[in-house]
């Protein structure tokens, strides 16, 4: 007789009792341990993790280089606050990121804690540099859950419900979406119209864009669109901010998504996979722009914590030593081909898209009108979990299934995930 009692139901009741409903947990699981691209819950069941803590674990769970770096740093300095005293991991990380992003140009970096905090500080820096106040963001974009981050985010539900009034002088314009009929030319014309009718270019401090929209549905901005945006911002003295919080650190096959377009942003926001699971974010940008705020204008008690900076340095080392950029690109192609095979058999998969190892399926109710099917998406997510695969949804209509597996995922795990997804599709469609 098996006397083992599952812990999960009790722990989920504890979660419901003591954690507010506004903090959604996508899967009714309680995790005990993790390694690489795998998780085990408190009852011992194994799952393939194709969420990666929502894109935080490009390096995988508990990478040995990251674990060793954090353990070593913990023996020296765990926290000191950079506004009080400097410490070497912060300085070394700032130099490496500036060299990675800026090349031979003079760049500087400031570190914070969360992605939303990096976005807010990027806007502050842009406003200080230009002495302008307006900001343009994109429909479907996601830039965090703080009040300014929510204002910049181009989706209403659930992020903006009952949280207003929002920050002033933030404007939204269409993002290219070939599947929904929005070309680069159409998006650029809409931006021109915005500048002609709602806010003059000489009042715009910054334009902020994700090179691949994350929560908005894994839409990749075409190269020509990013290049045109760079030309427009240079013409009008507008700071171009690339939000690389989800796309950075190998997710698209390059260090950063903007590198596919061959452009040089003014400011870049980084977070998520930067520190391999530890809380760390940053703004990296041209030195003249980064130095615009007065002394004391930037900061944060935990920003650039010594443990997180040590972890980030280990992440960069691991990427270079293990050729993870090339690996991610190869894994992305393997996953893409598998998803295309599924699409060929199921018309409900309207689109397979993304960049590198940042891929998604868009699910629809009918092939002609392409009506979003959020219900099918949720049922597929639930069925995949039962089969041992964790994935989550995104998209303005929540009908997009996204994949954010670690770059250390094996080919066998990719194939296993595709097999689980295939079976889950068959069950929910029948």
Q: How would you name each of these model-derived features?
A:
Residues 2-430:
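Conserved N-terminal phosphate-binding loop of PLP-dependent enzymes in the Aspartate aminotransferase
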């Amino acid at each position: 007789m098996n006397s083992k009692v599952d812990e999960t139901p009790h722990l989920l009741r504890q979660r419901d009792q003591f954690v507010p409903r506004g903090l959604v947990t996508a899967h009714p699981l309680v995790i005990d341990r993790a390694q690489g691209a795998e998780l085990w819950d408190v009852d011992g069941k194994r799952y393939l993790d194709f969420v990666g803590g929502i894109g935080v674990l490009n390096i995988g769970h508990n990478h040995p280089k990251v674990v060793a770096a954090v353990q070593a740093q913990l023996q020296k300095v765990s926290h000191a606050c950079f506004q009080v005293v400097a410490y070497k991991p912060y300085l070394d990380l700032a130099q490496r990121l500036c060299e990675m992003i800026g090349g031979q140009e003079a760049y500087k970096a400031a570190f914070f804690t969360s992605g939303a905090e990096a976005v807010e500080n990027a806007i502050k820096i842009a406003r200080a540099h230009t002495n302008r106040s307006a900001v343009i963001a994109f429909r479907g974009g996601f830039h965090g859950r703080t009040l300014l981050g929510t204002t910049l985010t181009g989706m209403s539900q659930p992020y903006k419900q009952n949280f207003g009034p929002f920050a002033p002088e933030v404007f939204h314009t269409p993002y290219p979406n070939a599947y929904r009929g929005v070309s680069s030319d159409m998006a650029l014309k809409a931006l021109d119209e915005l500048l002609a009718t709602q806010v003059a270019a000489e009042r715009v401090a910054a334009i902020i864009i994700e090179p691949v929209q994350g929560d908005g549905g894994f839409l990749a901005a075409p190269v020509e669109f990013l290049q045109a945006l760079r030309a427009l911002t240079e013409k009008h003295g507008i700071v171009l901010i690339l939000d690389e919080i989800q796309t950075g650190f190998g997710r698209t096959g390059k260090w950063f998504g903007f590198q596919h377009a061959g452009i040089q942003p003014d400011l870049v926001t980084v977070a998520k996979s930067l520190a391999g699971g530890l809380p760390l974010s940053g703004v990296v940008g041209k030195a003249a722009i980064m130095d615009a705020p007065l002394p004391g204008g930037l900061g944060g008690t935990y920003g650039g914590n010594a443990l997180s900076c040590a972890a980030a340095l280990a992440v960069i080392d691991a990427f270079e030593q293990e050729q993870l950029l090339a690996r991610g690109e190869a894994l992305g192609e393997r996953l893409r081909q598998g998803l295309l095979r599924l699409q060929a058999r199921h018309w409900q998969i309207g689109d397979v898209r993304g960049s590198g190892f940042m891929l998604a399926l868009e699910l629809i109710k009918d092939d002609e009108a392409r009506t979003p099917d959020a219900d099918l998406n949720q049922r597929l997510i639930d069925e995949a979990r039962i089969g041992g695969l964790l994935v989550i949804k995104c998209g303005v209509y929540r009908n997009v299934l996204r994949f954010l597996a670690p770059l250390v995922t094996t080919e066998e795990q990719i194939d296993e995930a595709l097999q689980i997804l295939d079976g889950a599709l068959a069950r929910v469609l029948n």
